[in-house]
């Protein structure tokens, strides 16, 4: 039986038990001493793949650690799980679906059957439709109701219909095509729509409504607000089709909204929202950077798919990162993981990875519904590196929690200013170095003596200047952010998340926890507006409803 039908008890596996013993033996392991003792440690714990360079030498591991972690991957049947995903088996068991976002980046000529049907012709048909539409808009052939070319495109979507496309279009801003500006509208908060629409003209604005079901509350409310605004600005119902297109699997609902069927791009149930930027959900990406660059993005992801499927686990970038995450989360009691990009254009990668990781692996039952016996997904947090140094890096250095971190940095800047980028790169490296080295009591005292402090003051101040060190991190270096390398980077994290789900025996591709809040939200709304008089299920919620109703105006 496949792993997703008969989930294992990972804690009973020999490799897991060996790792527990190894963890005890590693209690006094010092990275500082390991580097001093082994001049080749950097070479032994680093690798290149798909335009990315990974240094994972600043981790609490030895070669034995890596071997044991790889053994764990083998014992859970990771290779078979990878094959199952790429071949279209139903690995999303709770929803009865295959998981094939990887099909979206496979080249022309590949074959892949879902329910006996080769899906690749349809995938490339949609990609060709994207290419045609983007070309018409960039060439000024798609015109609004006043016959003026489109200048602004607003993507209306939330979750995976927003976070991935926003990340990519902003990360690749240096590749932006002239003439068309792309914007994103996700939050149901009216202030977001107000601020965005204030800078738009209806006659030259195109809205993309991105919702698989065409029933997502926030997206539909924003789409209706956009429609009302469009009509108030001088647009007409008859010309609505010029200003609204959709990405959805619910054609009937999109047509009822006023969108022409030929302007509805399909979605497939074998592509989850947080994995959908490679699909027609990526239409705003293609509009922002052009279809040639969008296809380069897909190609970069495809190269990582190939690496993931073929590289030995001890030289497999997504697998190694996943195993390190399991090592810290399950054996070192780490509850969170920091993502620290040292690049302005990558500032939104943490938000995307939060959804990718936490929505995928925030699970407490195995594939068969029985409780897990281990901790699963960590909290993902972080932000732009240099800014974080003056905010939360203090917790990384001297806090009581062990928090592994990923540093992401390019070698070349798109916008060099004097020696700014050299300082940026130096800051990135020095932060990972400081986490690893720390500062001993002796070093702190010597530093204070060199400044002329007396012994009494040194005795008081030195403990505050001690930094434990031995804090783990990975450093991911790219020569320069490009569509191809970014595609590989995002795909790498996708595969990392999948590997961890296989080890824990959970389903990374459903999100039932998200649904409960949606269901309860309907009842809360009805009570807020007075259409439902029954009390809420609990006193706290009812009290907050009463507070709102007693004070709300408008």
Swiss-Prot record:
Active site: 359 (proton donor), 390, 518
MF term (GO), any: monosaccharide binding
A Pfam family that the UniProt record links to this protein: PGI
Assigned EC number: 5.3.1.9
Swiss-Prot/TrEMBL GO biological process terms: gluconeogenesis; glucose 6-phosphate metabolic process; glycolytic process
Localization, UniProt: Cytoplasm
Entry keywords, A to Z: Cytoplasm, Gluconeogenesis, Glycolysis, Isomerase
InterPro entries in UniProt: G6P_Isomerase, G6P_Isomerase_C, Phosphoglucose_isomerase_CS, SIS_dom_sf, SIS_PGI_1, SIS_PGI_2
Catalytic activity: alpha-D-glucose 6-phosphate = beta-D-fructose 6-phosphate
A Gene Ontology term for the protein's cellular component: cytosol
Subcellular location, principal: cytoplasm
EC category name: isomerase
CDD domains: SIS_PGI_1, SIS_PGI_2
Pathway: Carbohydrate biosynthesis; gluconeogenesis; Carbohydrate degradation; glycolysis; D-glyceraldehyde 3-phosphate and glycerone phosphate from D-glucose: step 2/4
HAMAP family listed in its UniProt record: G6P_isomerase
Assigned protein family: Belongs to the GPI family.
Function: Catalyzes the reversible isomerization of glucose-6-phosphate to fructose-6-phosphate.
Name the UniProt record assigns to this protein: Glucose-6-phosphate isomerase
Organism encoding this protein: Pseudomonas putida (strain ATCC 700007 / DSM 6899 / JCM 31910 / BCRC 17059 / LMG 24140 / F1)
Classification of source organism: Bacteria, Pseudomonadati, Pseudomonadota, Gammaproteobacteria, Pseudomonadales
Gene from which this protein is expressed: pgi
